[in-house]
């Protein structure tokens, strides 16, 4: 199936995979849940996805964590329970270990490129995680995007230079720069005045599109 032709109907559903990431990103809103993961298991994931497919056969599904790529074989089993009519997104740090290198990770993700709409890869100005080699991005055939959170350092003098180097590093790749979304509300999501991150981005890049509320309905 051509993933670009999939339609979306119904709410986006986020599934927290049953694997902790062993990281401590300060903006993570899920870490507290993984302090006790006794209620997480794969069978519950399967049942939830099967039920979801019956209720919302055309909605978006997001795998997040924790770390969805902590167990690649289990990830493939979970993907198999996502119906072909869904858009599937995976949030990951692309973790490597002695049991899985970048080639193994790329092999698994590429094998499911017809199912995966996008792999969202966490990379930040501050290194909160152990990052694998950037060579992996040349190995990935599946669509992928670099997600960078500017946490509380948008005002720091060094952030501008770091961000420019970051964008040069990932030149040619999709990059999403965002603030700590746990601070967003329906009231402030469209406010740009006094927004340190928005000011920083306007200082180094040309912003070409208006903030249209219609796009967020």
Where is each model-derived feature located?
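Acidic (Asp/Glu)-rich catalytic clusters
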Residues: 52-55, 83, 105-114, 133-141, ...
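Radical SAM enzyme [4Fe-4S]-AdoMet core and its adjacent flexible, acidic
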Residues: 37, 124-217
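Core AdoMet radical
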Residues: 12, 31-43, 56-71, 84-101, ...
């Amino acid at each position: 199936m051509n993933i670009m032709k999939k339609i979306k109907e119904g709410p986006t559903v986020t599934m927290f995979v049953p694997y902790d990431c062993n990281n401590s990103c300060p903006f993570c809103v899920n870490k507290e849940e993984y302090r006790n993961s006794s209620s997480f298991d794969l069978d519950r994931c399967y049942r939830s996805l099967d039920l979801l497919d019956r209720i919302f056969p055309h909605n978006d599904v997001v795998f997040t964590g924790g770390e969805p790529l902590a167990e690649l074989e289990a990830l493939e089993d979970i993907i198999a329970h996502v119906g072909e009519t869904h858009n599937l997104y995976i949030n990951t740090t692309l973790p490597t270990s002695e049991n899985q290198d970048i080639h193994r990770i790329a092999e698994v993700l590429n094998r499911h490129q017809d199912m995966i709409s996008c792999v969202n890869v966490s990379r930040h100005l501050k290194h909160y995680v152990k990052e694998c080699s950037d060579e992996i991005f040349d190995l990935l055939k599946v669509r992928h995007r670099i997600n960078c959170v500017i946490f509380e350092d948008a005002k720091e003098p060094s952030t501008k230079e770091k961000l420019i180097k970051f964008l040069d590093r990932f030149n040619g790749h999709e990059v999403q720069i965002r603030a700590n979304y746990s601070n967003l509300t329906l009231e402030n999501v469209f406010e740009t005045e006094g927004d340190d991150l928005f000011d920083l981005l306007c200082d180094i890049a040309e912003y070409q599109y208006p903030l249209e509320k219609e796009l967020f309905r």
